[in-house]
Amino acid sequence: MTYLWINPVSERMISAAALEKLLKKHDLTQVVCQESWGEIVLRKYRELLEHADGTFADARCPEAVSLVRSLQPEIQIADIEPILIHCARELAERPDLADCEKIITTPCRILADMGNKLELKDTHFVPWNRFLASIGEPMEPAPDASPIPPGFFKDLPFPVVSKSGRPAIESYVTGNEWKDARLIELLYCVQGCHRGDGVR
Protein backbone atom coordinates (compact mmCIF):
# COMPACT_ATOMS: atom_id res chain seq x y z
CA MET A 1 0.00 0.00 0.00
CA THR A 2 1.16 3.55 -0.75
CA TYR A 3 0.11 6.41 1.52
CA LEU A 4 -0.16 9.99 0.30
CA TRP A 5 0.09 13.08 2.52
CA ILE A 6 -1.00 16.26 0.77
CA ASN A 7 0.29 19.60 2.02
CA PRO A 8 -2.40 22.22 2.82
CA VAL A 9 -1.62 24.40 -0.22
CA SER A 10 -1.96 21.51 -2.66
CA GLU A 11 -5.09 20.25 -0.93
CA ARG A 12 -6.76 23.56 -1.85
CA MET A 13 -5.90 22.91 -5.50
CA ILE A 14 -7.98 19.77 -5.98
CA SER A 15 -11.68 19.13 -5.40
CA ALA A 16 -12.80 16.31 -3.12
CA ALA A 17 -14.28 14.47 -6.12
CA ALA A 18 -11.11 14.83 -8.21
CA LEU A 19 -8.96 13.70 -5.28
CA GLU A 20 -11.11 10.64 -4.66
CA LYS A 21 -10.85 9.73 -8.34
CA LEU A 22 -7.05 10.22 -8.34
CA LEU A 23 -6.56 8.09 -5.22
CA LYS A 24 -8.67 5.26 -6.62
CA LYS A 25 -7.08 5.36 -10.08
CA HIS A 26 -3.52 5.19 -8.73
CA ASP A 27 -4.19 2.91 -5.76
CA LEU A 28 -3.20 5.53 -3.18
CA THR A 29 -4.51 6.05 0.35
CA GLN A 30 -4.60 9.58 1.72
CA VAL A 31 -3.24 9.86 5.24
CA VAL A 32 -3.38 12.65 7.80
CA CYS A 33 -1.40 13.34 10.95
CA GLN A 34 -2.77 12.41 14.36
CA GLU A 35 -0.92 15.22 16.14
CA SER A 36 -1.69 18.94 15.72
CA TRP A 37 1.79 19.84 14.52
CA GLY A 38 0.96 23.48 13.80
CA GLU A 39 0.02 24.01 17.45
CA ILE A 40 3.04 22.03 18.66
CA VAL A 41 5.45 24.04 16.51
CA LEU A 42 3.90 27.31 17.69
CA ARG A 43 4.37 26.18 21.30
CA LYS A 44 8.03 25.37 20.58
CA TYR A 45 8.59 28.93 19.35
CA ARG A 46 6.90 30.36 22.43
CA GLU A 47 9.13 28.23 24.69
CA LEU A 48 12.24 29.23 22.72
CA LEU A 49 11.52 32.93 23.11
CA GLU A 50 10.69 32.54 26.80
CA HIS A 51 14.10 31.00 27.53
CA ALA A 52 16.49 32.60 25.03
CA ASP A 53 17.69 36.13 24.35
CA GLY A 54 18.15 37.96 21.08
CA THR A 55 16.38 37.93 17.74
CA PHE A 56 15.39 34.69 16.04
CA ALA A 57 14.39 33.93 12.47
CA ASP A 58 11.45 31.64 11.85
CA ALA A 59 12.82 28.39 10.37
CA ARG A 60 9.69 27.09 8.58
CA CYS A 61 10.90 28.22 5.14
CA PRO A 62 14.36 26.83 4.26
CA GLU A 63 14.83 29.22 1.30
CA ALA A 64 14.25 32.24 3.55
CA VAL A 65 16.54 30.78 6.23
CA SER A 66 19.32 30.38 3.66
CA LEU A 67 18.89 34.01 2.59
CA VAL A 68 19.02 35.35 6.17
CA ARG A 69 22.11 33.25 6.96
CA SER A 70 23.92 34.75 3.97
CA LEU A 71 22.92 38.35 4.72
CA GLN A 72 22.80 38.72 8.51
CA PRO A 73 24.71 36.15 10.59
CA GLU A 74 23.81 38.02 13.80
CA ILE A 75 20.21 36.83 13.52
CA GLN A 76 19.78 33.46 15.22
CA ILE A 77 17.94 30.73 13.33
CA ALA A 78 15.36 28.86 15.41
CA ASP A 79 16.34 25.19 15.69
CA ILE A 80 12.77 24.07 15.01
CA GLU A 81 11.89 22.00 11.97
CA PRO A 82 9.10 23.09 9.58
CA ILE A 83 5.59 21.79 10.32
CA LEU A 84 5.70 19.63 7.19
CA ILE A 85 8.83 17.86 8.46
CA HIS A 86 7.21 17.25 11.85
CA CYS A 87 4.24 15.68 10.02
CA ALA A 88 6.50 13.48 7.92
CA ARG A 89 8.43 12.23 10.97
CA GLU A 90 5.15 11.18 12.59
CA LEU A 91 4.03 9.30 9.46
CA ALA A 92 7.42 7.62 9.04
CA GLU A 93 7.35 6.35 12.63
CA ARG A 94 3.69 5.35 12.95
CA PRO A 95 3.22 1.59 13.52
CA ASP A 96 -0.05 1.54 11.56
CA LEU A 97 1.80 2.77 8.45
CA ALA A 98 4.89 0.59 8.88
CA ASP A 99 6.56 -1.04 5.87
CA CYS A 100 4.44 0.92 3.39
CA GLU A 101 5.61 3.70 1.10
CA LYS A 102 4.75 7.22 2.22
CA ILE A 103 4.67 10.09 -0.28
CA ILE A 104 4.86 13.57 1.26
CA THR A 105 3.90 16.33 -1.18
CA THR A 106 5.45 19.77 -0.76
CA PRO A 107 4.65 23.26 -2.11
CA CYS A 108 8.28 23.78 -3.19
CA ARG A 109 11.38 21.93 -4.32
CA ILE A 110 13.59 23.06 -1.42
CA LEU A 111 11.26 21.54 1.21
CA ALA A 112 11.24 18.28 -0.74
CA ASP A 113 15.05 18.31 -0.86
CA MET A 114 15.22 19.05 2.87
CA GLY A 115 12.89 16.16 3.64
CA ASN A 116 14.64 13.64 1.40
CA LYS A 117 18.01 14.41 3.02
CA LEU A 118 16.57 13.08 6.30
CA GLU A 119 16.22 9.61 4.70
CA LEU A 120 13.12 8.76 6.73
CA LYS A 121 12.14 5.11 6.39
CA ASP A 122 9.87 4.36 3.41
CA THR A 123 9.20 8.09 3.05
CA HIS A 124 9.70 10.19 -0.08
CA PHE A 125 9.16 13.93 -0.46
CA VAL A 126 8.10 15.36 -3.82
CA PRO A 127 6.77 18.75 -4.98
CA TRP A 128 3.05 18.60 -5.81
CA ASN A 129 3.55 19.46 -9.49
CA ARG A 130 6.20 16.76 -9.95
CA PHE A 131 4.02 14.23 -8.16
CA LEU A 132 1.10 14.91 -10.50
CA ALA A 133 3.38 14.81 -13.56
CA SER A 134 4.81 11.46 -12.43
CA ILE A 135 1.35 9.88 -12.46
CA GLY A 136 0.16 11.69 -15.58
CA GLU A 137 -2.43 13.89 -13.88
CA PRO A 138 -3.13 17.57 -14.71
CA MET A 139 -2.58 20.30 -12.14
CA GLU A 140 -5.25 22.78 -11.17
CA PRO A 141 -4.26 26.45 -10.70
CA ALA A 142 -2.77 27.43 -7.35
CA PRO A 143 -5.14 29.29 -4.99
CA ASP A 144 -5.09 33.10 -5.03
CA ALA A 145 -4.34 33.19 -1.31
CA SER A 146 -2.30 30.88 0.87
CA PRO A 147 -4.09 28.64 3.40
CA ILE A 148 -1.10 29.43 5.62
CA PRO A 149 -0.61 33.20 5.12
CA PRO A 150 1.77 35.42 7.09
CA GLY A 151 0.60 35.81 10.68
CA PHE A 152 1.31 32.34 12.10
CA PHE A 153 2.99 33.89 15.17
CA LYS A 154 0.65 36.87 15.66
CA ASP A 155 -0.69 35.66 19.02
CA LEU A 156 2.73 35.21 20.64
CA PRO A 157 3.37 37.74 23.45
CA PHE A 158 6.62 38.95 21.88
CA PRO A 159 7.56 41.55 19.25
CA VAL A 160 7.09 39.66 15.96
CA VAL A 161 7.75 41.09 12.50
CA SER A 162 6.52 39.34 9.36
CA LYS A 163 8.33 39.59 6.02
CA SER A 164 7.54 37.79 2.79
CA GLY A 165 9.27 37.94 -0.58
CA ARG A 166 13.01 38.19 -1.17
CA PRO A 167 13.19 42.01 -1.57
CA ALA A 168 11.31 42.64 1.70
CA ILE A 169 13.45 40.14 3.60
CA GLU A 170 16.71 41.52 2.19
CA SER A 171 15.77 45.10 2.98
CA TYR A 172 14.74 44.26 6.54
CA VAL A 173 17.64 42.06 7.65
CA THR A 174 20.35 44.29 6.13
CA GLY A 175 19.07 47.30 8.09
CA ASN A 176 18.94 47.74 11.87
CA GLU A 177 15.21 47.44 12.58
CA TRP A 178 15.45 43.67 13.03
CA LYS A 179 17.16 44.24 16.38
CA ASP A 180 13.82 45.44 17.81
CA ALA A 181 12.10 42.12 17.04
CA ARG A 182 12.28 38.90 19.01
CA LEU A 183 11.03 36.79 16.11
CA ILE A 184 11.03 37.42 12.36
CA GLU A 185 8.42 35.45 10.46
CA LEU A 186 9.87 34.64 7.04
CA LEU A 187 8.22 33.43 3.84
CA TYR A 188 10.40 33.52 0.73
CA CYS A 189 7.36 33.45 -1.55
CA VAL A 190 5.27 36.63 -1.41
CA GLN A 191 2.33 36.21 0.98
CA GLY A 192 2.79 32.46 1.37
CA CYS A 193 3.57 29.02 -0.01
CA HIS A 194 0.85 29.16 -2.69
CA ARG A 195 3.52 30.85 -4.84
CA GLY A 196 6.02 28.01 -4.34
CA ASP A 197 7.72 26.39 -7.33
CA GLY A 198 6.03 23.10 -6.47
CA VAL A 199 2.49 24.38 -7.03
CA ARG A 200 3.01 26.63 -10.07
Named regions from a protein language model:
Residues M1-R200:
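Iron-sulfur-associated redox domains of electron-transfer enzymes in respiratory
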